[in-house]
Amino acid sequence: MKLKLMILDRNIKTSENNDNDSWEKISNKLEEEYQEVQEAIREHSDKLHIAEELLDVQQVVIRGLILLVKEGFDLRQLFSRHNKKLVNRGWKEKKIINIFIKEWF
């Protein structure tokens, strides 16, 4: 199965631009999207609505990862460190999601 999520550039409707992203902007957006997920779950929304809100959170996480790369972090090292942390906490993998970044900025 091949899944695609976009690394966003700019929004032509709202004039948001991820080239000048900041941790404050990401924090605010993450809080907004998190609240929308919580609301959808509490209201027992249809699962499609919950999925849409969860993917919005995922999109903000991608923004954060991109900002880390811009600040000099290596995603491979970060992912490896994260996976080791989970294994050390006793988690066993069920499957693996491979991420391929088509173009780097």
Region roles according to the model:
Residues 1-105:
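Flexible "arm" and connector segments at domain edges
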